[in-house]
Structure formats: C-alpha cells, structure tokens
C-alpha cells in the first residue's frame, strides 16, 4: 500500500515548535500560609477546592534518625491544626538542611484529619502506611521546568513531517497503537489527563473533586515524586485512576543519549511497579519533546506515547475565566485534555469543565478507554 503522507501533508497544520523553543517557567503561585513557629519551616501553605482544605508543610532539619524526623513531623502536624482547625489533611516533607528543592526529602507523610490521633501517637515511623522514609538515595538530577504547550518532534524533517501527518490522520480516524495524538472523533468520549503527579498539596484536592463527580482520569507520574509520596500513588489507583510514565526526573529526553532515555523510562516504570504491582502502559514525554529514538525506546519498553489535543495553559497563571473559555472552546469528541497536577488554576476550573462535558453529552475518562469508547 502506498504511504498517505504526501496527501496528508498538504492538509497538515503549521509546523510545531522545534527544540529551540524557550522553556516556560511555572508562574509564582501566591498561596495562603500557616503561621507556624516551629524552627526550620521553609514553607507552610494551605489550599481548598471548594469542599475541603489541605496543607503542605516543608521543613529543613539537621536530624537524620527516623525517630527524630518523626517527632519533628508530629510537632508540625500539631501546629498546623492549631493554626487552621478546618484542614482535612496535613501533608509533610522534611528535607536535610540546607533545603534544596532538587533533593529527595528525608521523610514525607500524609495525615488526614481522621488519622491525626494515630499519627501523633506513633513512636515508630514504619508503623504508619502514609509515611515514607528515604532509604538513603542521593545524587538526583534536578527536575527541569519543562512545561507542555504542544508536541515538539525533534529530528530530521522527514520525521517531523510524518508526525504531523499522523496527528492529522488520527484527528479524523482515531488513535493507532504506539503513538496516540487523538481519540475517535466519532465517539462521545474525551480523555482527561494530568501531568506531573503526585503533589502533596494538590493531589488530595484533585482526587476529592474527581470523586465527587465520578470521573476517572490518567495521571502521568514523575518517578521521583512517586518515590517520595507513594501513598498518593496508591490513592490514585484505589480511586480507579490510570497511571502513566512521565519519566523519573522530568527532563527533556531528545538531548539525552539513548541509554539515559531508557533509564528515565525504566526507573519510572520500576517505581510505579514497586508501589502498585503494575507497570504503566502509557508514556508522555516532558514538554511533549520527543525524537525517533524516544519513540523507539518507549515502544521497546511496551509504552504507548500519548500526546494531547487540548492544553488550555493552566500552568500560565491565567484567570479562571480565560481557562474556562479555552477548555470549553476545545472540548470535543476524541479529545485528549492536558491539565497539571500542581496548579491552582486547575482546581479552580475543573468543576466547570466536568459540568460542561456532561452538558454536552461527552464522557470523560482515562486514556485507556479511548479505543473502547462507544455510543
């Protein structure tokens, strides 16, 4: 059969941005703070989703023994609830001093209000299932602030042209194995996806909103985040959501040698398999930046590479009304919506978006349901 690329290229959209496109930083998010007096507080913030509030307390400490870290975490939990009794959950991240965001924490914990008494009575940290102790891992790459805009194929022009044509073809006929740009435009179903999970402040609030609506989604998980907050990964799975691979360190893959690309994907797979017992089926490259080598390695690891049709720019600090208009304008059968797990704007517009999809008769769900959607 003759290839259809030349015909499709006549109809293809303008070329996507190339590798030189500047990286857009996450905007500063001015969150309300808790007035904690405990020494070593780096940040103590809280946030609500219209139904519940959660807090995230970050501390730096010279302590290294598990019992000392636990005592500090317990003091922080007590102070947080004294400062704001309405909190439904307090989440903690304890780092070695001096604090560096690129390090893995020494200890993390999640304390729902209903388990506060249990947590405060602990004498041994390993007896609490929503606590993680760093086993001594160091030397991690800092995560890059690579934010998704639109897919960026990098490589020969023939490869970029082929990918543009594939994108256009799928927008008319639906997804194909291996690389997914679009769902079936003839089915009243769209995929809802969140990148950069899990986050100790935002993930519990997102889970609560999705549970209230009965909607399932795909969360593309950063391996180092999953390693430090495994209980949130378990929460996602227990709630019926799907997990995808978003690399271990969240770095641009095309610039890496093939063995490092493979390592990024393998490490994330291994972390998720250790936590959940299952290896993910889907992968999304950070920033949507990929090359023939990235696709080949993902395919060899049994991962389908997933892109998106709709990115409203929730990371850009836009007003809720702007995000709502963008989401509504692009809501369509077969769409793949990209939002982020760590942005205030996502929490603000998600209820509106879920309601609009229902009004239009569109079912929202995980990527894995795209080929299975039926009228």
Named regions from a protein language model:
Residues 84-96, 218-222, 279-285, 367:
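Surface-exposed patches in mature extracellular/periplasmic domains of secreted proteins
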Residues 68-86:
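Short, non-transmembrane amphipathic alpha-helical segments
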């Amino acid at each position: 059969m003759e290839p259809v690329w030349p015909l499709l290229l006549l109809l293809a959209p303008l070329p996507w941005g190339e590798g030189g496109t500047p990286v857009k930083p996450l905007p500063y998010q001015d969150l309300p703070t808790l007035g904690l007096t405990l020494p070593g507080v780096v940040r103590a913030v809280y946030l609500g989703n219209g139904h519940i509030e959660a807090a995230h307390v970050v501390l730096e400490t010279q302590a290294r023994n598990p019992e000392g870290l636990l005592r500090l975490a317990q003091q922080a939990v007590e102070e947080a609830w004294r400062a704001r009794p309405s909190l439904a959950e307090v989440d903690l991240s304890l780092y070695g001093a001096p604090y560096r965001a690129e390090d893995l924490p020494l200890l993390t914990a999640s304390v729902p209000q209903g388990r506060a008494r249990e947590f405060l009575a602990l004498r041994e940290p390993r007896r609490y299932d929503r606590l993680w102790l760093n086993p001594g891992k160091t030397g991690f790459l800092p995560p890059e602030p690579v934010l998704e805009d639109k897919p960026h194929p990098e490589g020969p022009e023939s490869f970029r042209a082929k990918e543009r044509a594939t994108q256009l073809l799928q927008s008319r006929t639906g997804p194909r194995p291996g690389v997914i740009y679009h769902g079936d435009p003839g089915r009243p179903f769209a995929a809802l996806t969140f990148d950069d999970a899990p986050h100790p402040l935002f993930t519990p609030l997102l889970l609560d909103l999705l549970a209230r609506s009965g909607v399932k989604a795909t969360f593309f998980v950063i391996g180092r985040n999953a390693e430090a907050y495994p209980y949130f990964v378990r929460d996602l799975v227990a709630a019926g959501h799907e997990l995808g691979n978003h690399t271990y360190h969240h770095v641009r893959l095309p610039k890496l040698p093939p063995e490092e690309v493979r390592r990024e994907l393998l490490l994330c797979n291994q972390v998720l398999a250790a936590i959940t017992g299952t290896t993910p089926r889907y992968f999304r490259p950070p920033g949507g930046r990929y090359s023939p080598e990235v696709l080949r390695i993902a395919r060899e690891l049994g991962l389908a590479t997933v892109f998106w049709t709709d990115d409203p720019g929730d990371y850009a600090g836009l007003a809720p009304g702007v995000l709502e208009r963008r989401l509504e304008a692009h809501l369509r059968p077969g769409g793949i919506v990209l939002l982020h797990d760590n942005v205030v704007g996502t929490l603000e517009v998600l209820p509106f978006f879920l309601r609009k999809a229902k009004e239009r008769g569109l079912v929202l769900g995980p990527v894995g349901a795209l080929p299975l959607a039926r009228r």
